[in-house]
């Protein structure tokens, strides 16, 4: 009898990536059974920057164009450092609610469910949120 939490973990993941859960699976198993990321997970930063940039570009194209025009090839790295600083200084909930601002660009990192569906733009932005599911990571300080 398996006394580990693997079955429990698998059940949670199965629900989250089902149509009812609404999440996208960010990792899967290869032919040898090893877990591999389907998105670009940055281990040192512990974030999927490609997913965040995709979300911002899709939901806030004008701001993202301005941001990338200003920073050029460094845009993704600058975004990460600004995000990290904002979370450290103001807290994660503040950043989720208010987004970040850098060089005059206001960038939201998520959109909350609108009170009503009268404004189709707010509904569209809410539905554009990218919720990802990744199996737990092995952590080591060694």
Show where each model-derived region lies:
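An alpha-helical interface "stripe"
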Residues: 1-142
